[in-house]
């Protein structure tokens, strides 16, 4: 069963150039779904289109767009507590003038009616998931943390809301190998044990082959291959996909990322 189903998604710029060309995309419920492809293919554009968060100079059309079997009219109603977004611009998610504990508490209480103590309990739990301790984080400002620490705080700020769907654009790109694998292990645990759904854009093919159940391959704005993990491990693949897997452990990052 698909949690998101969008048909004939097309994205154009102001010069009427097609960046995404009429793709059909399903994000399967309670699975880790991945979108891979080379630099400039438009992967991040698809994520932003799903969130209705495209730059003003791009236009998006589709024939139908459903979330959990219902037609979507206003996606913003799902943000936070139902759909979480992990972007690459984690450094812009926190200001430098307020302690992180206060910012995280405000984020949680914006989405859930709760006491400060309840919010802090959820924050503490989420920070532990990303291998951080509240005592080391909550009384600090964002500029006092390393880039890797701040990215993990950002991921925790999404996880603490327990969204049904997480759209993650390069969620571990700035982390070292150990913490990157730990975060991916955590995301896999959330999907397998708690029934959440993940749509991940990544250039790390080792992560794709290890963690993902369903994969889309994007080339020049078109999906050229799709299938479950067994298809990509054991069946004959499109020549382009074979080259990606054979020659690149980690793809270059997208120009549009």
Swiss-Prot record:
Keywords per UniProt: ATP-binding, Cell membrane, Ion transport, Membrane, Nickel, Nickel transport, Nucleotide-binding, Translocase, Transport
Family annotation (Gene3D superfamilies): P-loop containing nucleotide triphosphate hydrolases
EC top class, as a word: translocase
Organism the protein comes from: Staphylococcus aureus (strain N315)
Domain ABC transporter as annotated: residue spans: 4-245
Name by which UniProt lists this protein: Nickel import system ATP-binding protein NikD
Record field: catalytic activity: Ni(2+)(out) + ATP + H2O = Ni(2+)(in) + ADP + phosphate + H(+)
Membrane topology qualifier: Peripheral membrane protein
Transport is among the record's keywords: yes
Primary role: Part of the ABC transporter complex NikABCDE (Opp2) involved in nickel import. Probably responsible for energy coupling to the transport system.
Subcellular location(s) of the protein: Cell membrane
UniProt-listed Pfam families: ABC_tran
Family classification: Belongs to the ABC transporter superfamily.
Record bears the keyword Nucleotide-binding: yes
Amino acids binding ATP: 37-44
Primary location recorded for the protein, binned into one broad class: membrane
Cited InterPro entries: AAA+_ATPase, ABC_Ni/Peptide_Import, ABC_transporter-like_ATP-bd, P-loop_NTPase
Assembly and binders: The complex is composed of two ATP-binding proteins (NikD and NikE), two transmembrane proteins (NikB and NikC) and a solute-binding protein (NikA).
